[in-house]
Amino acid sequence: MPDFSNSNLNSFIACLRSLSIKILIICHGFIVFSSLAEVPSRLTNFFSIMILLTFSNFSRTLGLEFI
């Protein structure tokens, strides 16, 4: 019988790692870009960060790991 608890733990740790990386990217984008310009520029940067995160999720489905 396989040990599913170890598999679940590894999956949970990988999920936390991925989530923490995404949170760091978003926070870094807001902190850095909010000091540079006004609201339209911040919105553009927000959408570019969201596109980056979407692409990283898509690349994971293909088996590629960029982030």
Swiss-Prot record:
One of its GO terms (cellular component) is membrane. It comes from Saccharomyces cerevisiae (strain ATCC 204508 / S288c) (Baker's yeast). Keywords: Membrane, Transmembrane, Transmembrane helix. The keyword Membrane applies. The chain crosses the membrane at residues 13-32, 42-64. Its main location: membrane. This is Putative uncharacterized protein YGL041C. It is a multi-pass membrane protein. It is found in: Membrane.
